[in-house]
Amino acid sequence: MALYEHVLLARQDISQQQVDALVEQFKGVLEANGGKFGKVENWGLRPLTYRIKKNRKAYYTLVNIDAPAAAVAEMERQMRINEDVLRFLTVRVEEHEEGQSAMLTRRDDRRERDGDDRPRRREGGFDRGDRGDRGPRRPRDNEAGEGA
């Protein structure tokens, strides 16, 4: 059987329990066709880059799947029918990653910071020093007369 990673986006106006029920429903479809679910990661309610079916946010869920192609095709068909599923993406992989996905580790990194995610500047105001792409500075007219 082939290994897949599957990301599911569910509508924002349903609860997290309903999202979990959706995942269980699709798990049943997959197992009925000879597949197995691996780890399930709920990424929570996140903003979308653009509106999808009048939704600005969606519940993201990542699922590792070990199933034949026919089982995955049937699960995707069921997702197209379901109104609570906004989008989904299934990608075939060579092996599943161990531990947390990159999305969850990035979220944990943000929590470890002090809550301020602005880039830090060097002290000293507006002067950032010489850029190095200009030649030496010519003296101004009033500077040349003072020195002589």
From Swiss-Prot:
Residues 96-148 are annotated as: Disordered. Binds together with bS18 to 16S ribosomal RNA. GO terms for molecular function: small ribosomal subunit rRNA binding; structural constituent of ribosome. GO terms for biological process: translation. This is Small ribosomal subunit protein bS6. GO terms for cellular component: cytosolic small ribosomal subunit. PANTHER family: MITOCHONDRIAL 28S RIBOSOMAL PROTEIN S6, SMALL RIBOSOMAL SUBUNIT PROTEIN BS6M. InterPro entries: Ribosomal_bS6, Ribosomal_bS6_sf, Ribosomal_S6_plastid/chlpt, Transl_elong_EF1B/ribsomal_bS6. The keyword Ribosomal protein applies. It comes from the Bacteria. Gene3D superfamilies: 3.30.70.60. NCBIfam families: S6. Belongs to the bacterial ribosomal protein bS6 family. The lineage of its organism: Bacteria, Pseudomonadati, Pseudomonadota, Alphaproteobacteria, Hyphomicrobiales. The keyword RNA-binding applies. Keywords: Ribonucleoprotein, Ribosomal protein, RNA-binding, rRNA-binding. The gene is rpsF.
